[in-house]
């Protein structure tokens, strides 16, 4: 938790007066992907003496902090995450909690089943790779809207934020919940566009 809390406290202290560039920088950078989701990365559930030396800093600090940031910003939202995190601290202060105690508290207070999240981030070394597979106009006419197909290429699943830009300047922001992946690796949805599509962006 140390890196995650440090990053948040630096941003919040004195209304951000001394805020520095986030520890994470650009979360989509090749550096983050290479070390957090690399082929040789160890699982977070391994004990430190089992984790490879080159991966220890990532497994102990960077990936857990990145995981908690994703849980707060993408999955639960700041309000629910902060309430659940505060309750975890209240329940387990001066005690000896296990990772399962943290998992259960976050789920209990937030009211969400997060088993899919822990399975991907903690219990396994799965990767996240989502893509736009197809874009097709309804009846082949741009003014009738568009059907977009997205695909999850790896085992990790996450909610999807989509930005659709039209040639006429209009933009559509769609937030799809993680449950869309329960029925398979592809999901189709329609957007009521009225002109040709300029761009479709995931996680804008």
Q: Where are the model-predicted features located?
A:
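Hydrophobic alpha-helical and helix-loop surface patches within well-folded domains
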Residues: 1-151, 200
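Beta-strand-rich binding/interaction modules
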Residues: 128-131, 135-203
